[in-house]
UniProtKB/Swiss-Prot annotation:
Any one Gene Ontology cellular component term annotated for this protein: small-subunit processome
Keywords: Nucleus, Ribonucleoprotein, Ribosome biogenesis, rRNA processing
SUPFAM superfamilies referenced in this protein's UniProt entry, alphabetically: P-loop containing nucleoside triphosphate hydrolases
Function per UniProt: DEAD-box RNA helicase-like protein required for pre-18S rRNA processing, specifically at sites A0, A1, and A2.
Cellular compartments annotated: Nucleus, Nucleolus
GO biological process: maturation of SSU-rRNA from tricistronic rRNA transcript (SSU-rRNA, 5.8S rRNA, LSU-rRNA)
Matching Pfam families: Utp25_C, UTP25_NTPase-like
Region described as Disordered: spans on this chain: 24-72
Biased composition (Acidic residues): 53-68
Protein name as it appears in the record: U3 small nucleolar RNA-associated protein 25
Length: 640
């Protein structure tokens, strides 16, 4: 025993305490109660009308305790000034969600959820169709069924937040979009909204920023008020905390997105003082904006400002100030890129890893998920894999005040997850199904898509060829077989040249590129890793028709948005993830028509797809066509 260090002894004691707390929910410690024959191909033709490092030490813990004690003293001296915030708990979604359920009711609901016992309901709304999924339970009620806010004053905001917001926007009015989202966001349900346009980015950000601030305010005030009561009567017992202080996690793609969020947060709080604001501005903004006006609007918006995707920031609230760059364990909100947070967590092979600061996240917000998809989706999955876990160390936790559902490892089922994206995608939808497990329910908004086939501005023959495959796992092989056996021979016979082969998946791109190399097929290629000098050479050779085929990846298009000259025809190896990319790609032959190297009626685009491609196909062909095209009896659909 004497060979053990003080830290090792403390850690052993902490682990023993956790076991004891979880082992018997009926016993009390001193101040707590543990609580998934190829058919003949048929053709359908349709004529279209034109139309900070997360480290802590004993000094940080002591500082946090002193600050908390100071805030409690302020509260005691202020008397009953917070009584104006008192709302009956049964009318406040915050209390209904986090305080009402017992661990037994939660355990029963979790079992139903894991067994797939989910009630589904589709409702028409102003944003299209919303699918609401809940675990049926007579006893468990984590949401207010009557919650339907029409104005900011209906959101059950803390009064000081409401006053600050109304000083900026006196009417308090919300748009139809905000009202529809707010009734689920502020009701603590999980939300996936994948139709955020460039015009409503700010509306969505304003809404989730309000929610994040409100949650932090309610958590902190609730804890401080109870601490004030305990200071006067130590016989009282409150279960009102998690293991660590951070309660809200915001995941964003770039430093500029973080800058916009923090500026909105500061504006809405009306904080008297913001510590480290100059440092924040220096590190998260840039002096000169250099983006061509010829680039699409969504591109200019996404890549505005500082586009660095490696950052993390702690934000701490006190009653009168906001501190930026606070240590994670002293922070209320953590704002980070998935890459930045993954680097802080460390790899699984690292001896020293730390992610305890994610143990008590109650609201997780992912904005611009489509941009994160084009970075590295695995980073996002990695972060959520390490969220709401039992902490390895105590970090100064007062276990007598830890909520029972934290001790029972049920917190991920009460965590609210909000995800916003410009479009839906397979990975985004999978995240919704596997990570958004809130027992209060989850809502996915499904917009009615008109499609983009007749919005190209000129005549081009658009052919969609369905590739037959027996299972999802066989899709890559089936697509490659169709491409190499059917389309490549046609390409080699075509003396016209100017064929752009667009490949969404980098792995498919590598496979096709290697096939071209093995078969000695002349081509050029541009992917996200191609050097600028090689890009210039490839574009010149392709335009001059010295190379008749160009391989082009989706991520290269996302980050560069090239408009190639010399394109006469397009083959899409699979449907683009973003329907806007389909529009941009199919418009490329227009330049060849203008340059006189392509007849006006000779432009063609061919898209390979499978029955499993409904998600990317729907915004391209429209909601009315997609089911028949993916599941109908015909394999070829042509739009002229």
């Amino acid at each position: 025993m004497s060979d053990l260090s003080k830290d090792e002894l403390a850690n052993d004691a902490y682990q023993a305490l956790l076991v004891m707390l979880k082992s018997d929910g009926k016993h009390k410690l001193k101040e707590e109660e543990a609580p998934r024959k190829r058919q003949k191909r048929n053709k359908v033709t349709e004529k279209l009308s034109v139309a900070q490092e997360p480290e802590e030490d004993e000094e940080n813990i002591e500082d946090a305790e002193q600050e908390s004690a100071s805030e409690v003293q302020e509260l005691l001296e202020a008397g009953d000034h917070l009584q104006e915030d008192e709302v009956p708990k049964e009318n406040d979604p915050f209390h209904t969600h986090y305080e009402a359920p017992s661990t037994e009711e939660l355990a029963s609901a979790i079992t139903k959820l894991n067994n797939g016992e989910i009630k589904k309901e589709n409702l028409d709304c102003s944003l299209g169709v919303k699918q609401i999924q809940q675990v049926p339970s007579e006893k468990l009620s984590l949401r207010l069924s009557s919650f339907a806010p029409a104005n900011v004053s209906d959101l059950k905001l803390k009064q000081r937040l409401l006053r600050s917001y109304l000083s900026i926007k006196p009417s308090g009015n919300m748009t139809n979009l905000q009202c529809e989202l707010a009734k689920h966001i502020f009701n603590y349900e999980d939300v996936l909204f994948s139709n955020v346009s460039s015009k409503c980015d700010t509306l969505v950000r304003n809404l989730y920023t309000l929610h994040a601030i409100n949650h932090v305010y309610k958590v902190r005030d609730h804890v401080l008020k109870n601490s004030a009561k305990l200071s006067q009567n130590q016989e009282l017992e409150f279960r009102d905390q998690g293991y660590t202080r951070p309660k809200v996690l915001i995941l964003l793609p770039t430093r500029n997105a973080c800058l916009q969020f923090v500026e909105t947060l500061i504006q809405f709080t009306g904080a008297e003082q913001v510590e480290n604001r100059k440092r924040f501005s220096n590190e998260f903004s840039i002096e000169t904006e250099v983006i061509s006006e010829k680039k699409p609007e969504d591109f200019r918006q996404l890549f505005a400002g500082n586009t660095d995707d490696m950052f993390r920031l702690g934000i701490k609230f006190t009653r009168k100030t906001i501190k930026l760059f606070s240590q994670f364990y002293n922070s209320d909100i953590i704002v980070a890129s998935p890459l930045g947070l993954r680097m802080a967590i460390g790899n699984k092979s690292d001896k020293k890893r730390d992610f305890d600061y994610l143990s008590s996240i109650e609201v997780a917000i992912v904005d611009q998920a489509d941009a994160l998809l084009m970075q590295n989706w695995e980073h996002l999955e990695y972060v959520f894999e390490h969220m709401n876990k039992l902490p390895k160390n105590s970090h100064g936790c007062d276990f007598s005040r830890v909520r029972p559902w934290y001790l029972e490892e049920q917190s991920r089922y009460l965590r609210q997850t909000l995800m916003f994206s410009h479009y839906n995608a397979v990975d985004i939808n999978a995240f919704y199904l596997h990570e958004m497990l809130n027992l209060a329910g989850r809502v996915k908004f499904h917009p009615k898509q008109k499609g983009v086939l007749n919005s190209l501005g000129y005549h081009i023959t658009q052919t969609f060829a369905r590739v037959q495959t027996e299972s999802l796992l066989k899709v890559p092989d089936a697509r490659f077989e169709h491409f190499t056996s059917t389309l490549v021979p046609q390409l080699l016979k075509n003396a016209m040249g100017g064929i752009l082969v667009y490949i969404p998946s980098y792995f498919d791109y590598v496979r096709v590129r290697n096939y071209f190399e093995d078969e000695a097929i002349s081509y050029v290629s541009i992917c996200e890793y191609t050097k600028n000098s090689d890009i210039s050479r490839a574009r010149t050779q392709f335009y001059q028709n010295r190379k008749q085929i160009m391989l082009y990846t989706e991520r290269a298009h996302h980050f560069r948005r090239f408009d190639f000259r010399g394109v006469r025809g397009i083959i899409m190896y699979a449907p683009p993830t973003n329907a806007q990319f389909y529009v941009e790609l199919t418009r490329m032959p227009m330049r060849s028509i203008s340059d006189g190297i392509l007849d006006a009626d000779a432009a063609k685009c061919r898209v390979l797809y499978t029955k499993y491609d409904m998600i990317p196909m729907e915004p391209i062909v429209g909601s009315e066509r997609v089911t028949n095209m993916c599941k109908g009896k015909h394999d070829i659909y042509e739009f002229v």
